[in-house]
Amino acid sequence: MNINLTMIGQAIAFFIFVVFCMKYVWPPVIQALREREKKIADGLQAAEHAQKDLELAQEKVAKQLREAKQQAAEIIEQANKRANQMLEEAKDQARTEGERLITAAKAEIDQEKNRAKESLRAEVAALALAGAEKILETSVDAGAHSNMLDKLAAEL
């Protein structure tokens, strides 16, 4: 009976130990486990949130990079257009200036040609008059001389 009594005593002690553990030891252990579980869940949630934020940031960076490349391409295209436009304007200005210089040179040549013709007319008229005087061996007065020169210049 000693063994049975010992077993009953051990069972009672075990029961008291279990009640004591359930009352004083088990709640802090369960609370610690729940806190740890909550920390892990919060950490996982924060990691998921950070992953989503990272994906959004990567998408935003990719979008900004595409926009920057597009803007750069537009700026380069505008610069090329402006360069071509400036080149065409310079060509037009050079062409206009060349035409103006050619026109001015032609006008100057015409003026020189007319001056040379007038000079030659005057010289030819003077020579013709001198020749006529020698032939006639008479002198013509200044008024008649001027009239003859004008008529001769008009005929030439």
From Swiss-Prot:
One of its GO terms (cellular component) is plasma membrane. The chain crosses the membrane at residues 5-25. It is found in: Cell inner membrane. GO terms for molecular function: proton-transporting ATP synthase activity, rotational mechanism; proton-transporting ATPase activity, rotational mechanism. It is a single-pass membrane protein. Keywords: ATP synthesis, Cell inner membrane, Cell membrane, CF(0), Hydrogen ion transport, Ion transport, Membrane, Transmembrane, Transmembrane helix, Transport. F(1)F(0) ATP synthase produces ATP from ADP in the presence of a proton or sodium gradient. F-type ATPases consist of two structural domains, F(1) containing the extramembraneous catalytic core and F(0) containing the membrane proton channel, linked together by a central stalk and a peripheral stalk. During catalysis, ATP synthesis in the catalytic domain of F(1) is coupled via a rotary mechanism of the central stalk subunits to proton translocation. Belongs to the ATPase B chain family. F-type ATPases have 2 components, F(1) - the catalytic core - and F(0) - the membrane proton channel. F(1) has five subunits: alpha(3), beta(3), gamma(1), delta(1), epsilon(1). F(0) has three main subunits: a(1), b(2) and c(10-14). The alpha and beta chains form an alternating ring which encloses part of the gamma chain. F(1) is attached to F(0) by a central stalk formed by the gamma and epsilon chains, while a peripheral stalk is formed by the delta and b chains. This is ATP synthase subunit b.
